[in-house]
Structures are given as structure tokens and as C-alpha cells.
Amino acid sequence: MVFAASEASQQAGKEALGRMYARKEDRDEATSWATREAQYDAVCAWGIPDHAALERVSAIEMPVFVANGDSDPMILPRYSYLLAGLIPQARLKIYPDAAHGFLFQHHAEFAADVTEFLA
């Protein structure tokens, strides 16, 4: 689910985990149960049609970087296209052979894309 089914994507996932666990200092704190519940509630609410939310998204005036993997089963790429199409100054990037963990799989490219976007 986090990485695409291809051998290359699965290998990139293993490498990402290796990078994460190699770091011994300055690691992020574990999230709280309340944080996890809030995330779950947000994911559940995402599937409920809300035209008012779409109108609010369309009112965003600042530049927005929308990114996703082309094989993401959690947030389907079509929703990334929809979101980017609704935000006037959105920039969309879909990473190939990647799922929900695209930013870990394509970490260097994603970091460069974010840096370029923020420049």
C-alpha cells in the first residue's frame, strides 16, 4: 500500500526504512493516540462529498504544491489532479512507479521539487 507492487518500488521502500532507522539522534517523537484518532477521522471524512469544501479549496490564492504517486491506493491520483485543478496556482507532480510512500521512494527528487517550488 505504501509502495507500488514493482520490484523496484519495493526495494526503494526497504531502502527508505533503512534510512529512517539508521538515524539515531534527533528523531521525531511518536505521535499520540489523539493524533492518530484525528488522522483516522480526517481520512474517513475525506470520502464524504462536501461541495462547500471544494469551494473553499478553490479560494486558495497562494501557490500550492500537490504531489502523489501514480499508483497510490489510499489517495487515488485522480484526486490529486482534481485538487490541483481546483487551486488556481497549484503545481502538480505525479511520481512514477510509486504509491503513498512516493516521497520516501523518490526522496531526492521530491526534496529538489519542494526546494524549487519554495524558491
Which residue stretches match the model-derived regions?
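Hydrophobic, aromatic-rich cap/lid helix
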Residues: R27-A53
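Catalytic active-site module of serine/aspartate enzymes centered on a nucleophile-bearing elbow/loop
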Residues: Q89-A119
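Conserved alpha/beta-hydrolase "acid-adjacent" motif
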Residues: P73-Y79
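Short beta-strand/loop motif that positions the catalytic acidic residue
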Residues: I60, V66-N68, D72
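Short acidic active-site motifs
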Residues: A52-R56, H106
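Helix-rich cap/lid subdomain of alpha/beta-hydrolase
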Residues: M1-R27
